[in-house]
Amino acid sequence: VLSAVLLATTGWSWYLGQVAEATVDRTDAIPGSGNEDSGGAAEAMNLLLVGSDSRADLTEEQLAELYAGTDSGLNTDTMILVHVPADGSAASFVSFPRDSYVQIPGHGEDKLNAAYAYGYAAVDSSLPETERQAGGAQLLVQTIHDLTGLQIDHYAEVDLLGFFELTSVVGGVEVNLCAAVDDREYSGAYFPAGPQTIAGADALKFVRQRHHYDNGLGDFNRIIRQQVFIAGVLRNMLSTDVLLDPGKQRELVEAAARSLTVDQDLDLFSLAAQMQSVTLDGITFQTVPMADPYAEDEQGRSIVRLEDEDTLHQFFAQLSAEPEAPEAPAAPPAPVDPSTVSVEVLNGSGISGLAASAQGELEAAGFTVTGTGNAD
């Protein structure tokens, strides 16, 4: 999505599109079944944007710098559905809490961020890693499809290293913290209060932090921070500093493409063309409707209970509804037949002969002149 925004705003987008296509990784993320057409406009697009906690490409030094630990990294801690209408006039981002308690096809109820891990584990371990990753992506796509009632057209995933590299190239995002943050025990976030620019490793800590000043709202505060940060990245990409700098454009496209793994059929150039009318005012951020954000499952784990299926499907149907076409302008009134109009010409100018001259022109145009004279 970020690379597409940049491609859509440049005069040499075809070239940048080729650069992105040559760099981006592909995965077979869209399942052949369990993701049926939801009947929306054919040209509209639903893209599942995923942030995984994969640490596969991180060195020990990077693990330490990013406070990433050494977990296996099969969870998807950030899941955002991006809807772009057929006319490309807007983009809606809907976040899903990672602890959303949902039906995962073939596995019953569990936290949403476990869907990828289930799909990954279901693929024979003797097969290539790329096939196991595709299995994880496909089950997550099926789960989101069932939740929303929408067909998921495309998939884009960024891991910890990719996010770190992208935010480093973007140059960071300006934030204004109401209070100092000290979450060094968990995410590593350690920021003073007040305005500051956050990039690279600090950016990753900022969007992953959920233990400090959360008042029990850790994951929801994290979602807000993620949405704020994405909006800031988009603002930077649409700034004149980028739009007027071809070198910066290429650098950002290369970083975005290196950071992403996308489905086999996502055409970045077509996506850019579809989003070329999107402005910051046309971008909205929401969170999926929740019934109980502080629930527990039978094992005593903290979970988020979402609204029922009908409510969720109605919410996403409204979200994906195409904007109504503006009403056609009223037809102009029928022209008046000049022969039906009677005119009396009175000369008030004081110049002799003007009334007679006007009479001749009006009669030539088809009007009926009932008389001429001088005005009082």
Short names for language-model regions:
Residues V1-D376:
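Non-catalytic, solvent-exposed segments at the cell envelope interface
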